[in-house]
Amino acid sequence: MAMTVHCDIVSAEQEIFSGAIELLVAASVEGDVGINYGHAPLLTALKPGPVRVKKLDGEEEIFYVSGGYLEVQPHVVTVLADTALRAGDMDEAAAEAAMKEAEQAIQSSEGLDYSKAAAQLAESAAQLRTLQAIRKKLQR
């Protein structure tokens, strides 16, 4: 039997996932991290992007988080996200439109709030990376 750890992925609004997993991979501010059974305790900030979870049956599920924190305890991994979505619930067209809008705002610089536009651009790019990860998974 595979060694597992319990995982909870929650946003401010709701619990997105709860269950036993073999592996979790996320983008932290220090770089990508992979968490499995026996990992040392850890608390790190997350960048916007995909969170991949490998469940007991070998199935991989992908979520999008807009940032937040990852906490690793001996038997529990918790993702506390600002916003969390199942990747299947994301709208690719809306993410592309938001990315183009942010790029145009940065280029035009009229009444520009650069930090807001840059944050919107980073979040849209992260959403698109998450959707690309799903496509790649489906092509296997």
From Swiss-Prot:
Q: What Gene Ontology terms describe what this protein does at the molecular function level?
A: ATP binding; proton-transporting ATP synthase activity, rotational mechanism
Which Pfam family is one of this chain's hits? ATP-synt_DE_N
Q: How does it sit in the membrane?
A: Peripheral membrane protein
What the entry lists under CDD domains is as follows:
F1-ATPase_delta
Q: Which UniProt keywords apply?
A: ATP synthesis, Cell inner membrane, Cell membrane, CF(1), Hydrogen ion transport, Ion transport, Membrane, Transport
* CC annotations in GO: plasma membrane; proton-transporting ATP synthase complex
Location(s) in or outside the cell: Cell inner membrane
Disulfide bonds listed in the record: none
- Which SUPFAM superfamilies does the entry mention? Epsilon subunit of F1F0-ATP synthase C-terminal domain (SSF46604), Epsilon subunit of F1F0-ATP synthase N-terminal domain (SSF51344)
Q: Which NCBIfam families match?
A: ATP_synt_epsi, PRK00571.1-4
Q: Provide the family line.
A: Belongs to the ATPase epsilon chain family.
Record's subunit section: F-type ATPases have 2 components, CF(1) - the catalytic core - and CF(0) - the membrane proton channel. CF(1) has five subunits: alpha(3), beta(3), gamma(1), delta(1), epsilon(1). CF(0) has three main subunits: a, b and c.
Question: What's its job?
Answer: Produces ATP from ADP in the presence of a proton gradient across the membrane.
Which protein are we looking at?
ATP synthase epsilon chain
Protein species of origin: Saccharophagus degradans (strain 2-40 / ATCC 43961 / DSM 17024)
